[in-house]
Every structure is written in C-alpha cells, then in structure tokens.
Amino acid sequence: MNKHNKSRSSFSGKIGYVLAAAGASVGLGNIWRFPYLAAKYGGGIFLLIYILLALTFGYSMIVAESAIGRMTRKSPVGAFQSFGKSKWLSAGGWINAIIPILIVPYYSVIGGWVIKYLIEYVKGNSTLLAEDGYFSGFISNGVSTELCFVVFCLITVAIIYAGVRNGIERVSKVMMPILIVLSVIIAVYSVTRPGALAGVKYFLVPNLKNFSWMSVVAAMGQMFYSLSIAMGILITFGSYMKKDTSIEDSTRNVEIFDTAIAIMAGLMIIPAVFAFSGGNPDTLQAGPSLMFITIPKVFANMGFGTVIGILFFLLVLFAALTSSIALTESAVSTFEDELGWGRKKSTVLIGVIMIALGTLSCLGYGPLSSVTILGMQFLDFFDFLTNSVMMPIAAIATCLLVSRVIGVAKIEEEIIHGESRFRRKKIFLVMIQYLCPVFALIILFSSVANAFGWITM
C-alpha cells in the first residue's frame, strides 16, 4: 500500500480534467478503428448502438473510476488497496496499473509511423506514400521505424516530465481545440467529394437490416478504446480532480467530446473512402492498412490531397500524443505512489520501459519478424494481451470493487459531493452492479475466441 506522504498533483479545475480525460479517449482507436468497425458492422446501426452504450456502459465506468480516484487520491494500486489488504484487491489494482505500461510502448510505435507519414506529406511525397508496398517496406526497415518511434517517445516523455499542470493540462488545452478544428475541416472536405453522400448516409442513418449481435459486441469493445476505461487512466486522473469539480458533469462533457470526435472521424474517412471505392465499404480495411495504405491512396486521388494529408496526419499525431500522454501519466503515477519516487525519476523509468518494449514491437515487422508469440508479431501480441484479455478483467475488477467492497452508497456520496443530486443514479446502479460486468465478460470471451479462430468477428 502507498505509504509515501506527499502533496498530490491536481488539475487546475474542470476544464483541465475534461480536456485531459477527453484527450485520453481521443486516440488512434477513434481515428481508424471506429470508422472501420462502423463500416464493417452496419454503419448507422453501429453508431446508434455505440452512442447508447456510451451513455450507459461508458458513462458508468467513467463515473466509477473517477470517483475511486478522487476518493482515495491514489493511482490504481493504492486506490484498490485503500479498501483492504486482500490479495484480490491488490491484483485488481495492479492489473489496472500494468495495462498502460504495456500499451504505451507499442502505441508509440504506431505514433512513430504517423510522424513518418506527416514528414513525407510535408516533403510533398504524397504519390510515394500511395504506392503499393510503401508501408510494408517502411515498417520492415528497422532503422527508420526505430528512429521515428524514439522521437514519438521523447515527445511524450518530455510532456510528462513537465508535470500535470505545466505538461499534461497545458498541452491538452492547446492540442484538443486544434484537433477539433482539423477534424471539422477534413470532415467537411470529405463529405463534399463526388459520391461521398452515399458514405454519409451509410454511416449516419441506422438500418435495422444491418443489425447483428456482433454489432453490439464490436461496439462494446470499442468502448474500451474510445473512453479509456479499464486502463487505470481515469482512476489516476480522478485522483488529480478537485473536490469541487462535478464528476457527473465532467463525465457528460467527456462523453460529448468523445462521441463528437468519433462521428467526425467517421465523416472524415467513410465518405472519402466510399467516393474513392465507388461505394464499397469493404475498402475500409482493419488496422494500420486503413490509415497507412488506403487513406494515402484516397488522398492521392483527391484535389489538394497533399494539404489534406498534412492536416490529417497532424490531427492523428495530436490524437496519438494526447492518448500516449494519458497512458504514460498513469504509469508514472503508479511509480510515484508505489516506489516513493519523484516525477522525474519515475518518468525516466517509464521512458526506458517504452524504448525497451517498444523496440520489440518496432522490429517485429523487420529484423525480428521470425519471432512470434502465439503466432502473433510482438505488436499484435501486446495489443491482444492488453485489449482482449487484461482490460475486460480490469473492468470486472472495478465493478466488483464498487459493488461488493466499497458499496455503491459510498461511491454515490463521492459523486454528489457539492451536487444537489445524482441525475443518472438508476442507470449507474444497474450498469455497475449487473450489466457492466456481463458486458466485460462477453468482450473477454468473444475477443479470445476470435483470436484463436473459434469465432469470426
């Protein structure tokens, strides 16, 4: 348990918390994973399901994690251990704490790819980026990918090194408004392309014929990516939240911000790809191939493609950085609390871990391509381990902590501190005690089954 008594860092107020939490949620998963899933699982019906889940499942988890953090003023390990010495409580805290430590290294590798593409667009090499084989050639080049990866890591670490207010909050206040403006500009340009309206209709208008159970499962899985739940981030950020900051109002603002950016991401990508492909949603492939192969081809066939490419990858870089900052801060907070170290020493340690683990993922498509775990490259394995296994378990642990250990009454007291009432109390109670754990179990089993080929998602 954390026995180190020192002043806890804090956000300056509600705006600082909301922008930092929203920045954590708006990452690479929102920019390329959300549009891909929306295209694959029914467009408008997927969007509708996602919004409903954000207002219930996502809302309840954000509120719970933020309340736990503010109540204890500790990072995940100390927060869980504040309520008892059980080994299960310790395990619940540590799994929340370890997740960001494992995610941020491989996440930074992809961030490095974004830097490379942004540089090439600035140099005017949009045609080169659209060529078949360019992406595979780049990621198999160990030196080039490692250099870009290290640059991304150094930017992230430098911001964390500066502290909560001078680093995280200040950067979020600059990056998030720019990100919004860029997303609006690109979305407007995308939806006005010839043939793009079919993509707009597919994405925004629900069609019950496209509904399937897998649409629900996929939308639930996207919740983890989009809202940064079950990563320890919101517990950490909650511990920096002032008592006079409304948890419920802040959560609502994060929901609005995240949903708006997710919709913008869909409008940036789906209509443009529809116009490029003649209305074939299958062109929206999964994973890196969408952002680093398909999108450059789309931009190469558009007027002002180079300019749009620069704006798009600048937007993606900002989104990647705001999320990597949140992930890294959660890890640093754990080291500060559990090891009694200062911010600078803790930041250096996570920087070393990022470089060490990230290098495995970075070289996994090149010099280390022959080395696999469960048939997966290093990056794919770390992604599977954290997102498909650890995060659902962390969510279940948080739900059990709230409903079985702390008690929903005490959590409610923390939520309504300084408030007249808990407006979505009934939704929260039903979700956190019953439905959220069930949803997390469904995600866990379906993701593992899909990874081993037992089902196809």
Locate each region found by the language model:
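Select transmembrane alpha-helical segments in multipass membrane proteins
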Residues: 10-21, 45-49, 87-101, 147-152, ...
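Membrane-water interface regions at transmembrane-helix termini and the short interhelical loops
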Residues: 37, 41, 67, 88-103, ...
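Helix-loop-helix connectors at the membrane interface of multi-pass transporters/channels
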Residues: 2-4, 78, 111-140, 241-244, ...
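Inter-helical loop and helix-membrane interface segments of multi-pass membrane transporters/permeases
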Residues: 5-8, 37-41, 76-95, 108-165, ...
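Transmembrane helix-boundary motif of multi-pass solute transporters/channels
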Residues: 13-53, 235-238, 249-252, 256-259, ...
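Membrane-embedded translocation segments of transport machinery
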Residues: 2-7, 11, 169, 173-321, ...
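A generic transmembrane alpha-helix motif of multi-pass inner-membrane proteins
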Residues: 379-401, 423-457
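Membrane-interface "cap" regions at the ends of multi-pass membrane proteins
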Residues: 1-32, 61-66, 70-83, 87-91, ...
